[in-house]
Amino acid sequence: MALNKNFIYKELNNEYMLIPVEGDSVSLTKVFNLNEVGSFIYKSLKEKDDIEYVVNKLTKEYQVSYDVAKKDVIDFINELKKRGIYE
């Protein structure tokens, strides 16, 4: 599985979003807004497409337990899959 390269990640005024690219244009009606943790997970997945790597980074960055971090990462990945962002 991997992140779909047809999405552009943008940060603007402390807002995080994934914007789908369709051909030569972007589709603003299908923008996926992220919170700070979602943004962190997405960027970590771009670094290394490995759940354990992302979970360990999340536990260190946000001082959460391994179990909480793993659930958050898996839930986030499942949402990305539903939206076609992670295939």
Q: What does each model-identified segment do?
A:
Residues M1-S39, K43:
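Acidic, low-complexity/disordered tracts enriched in E/D and polar residues
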Residues V31-E87:
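Long, charge-rich, low-complexity alpha-helical segments
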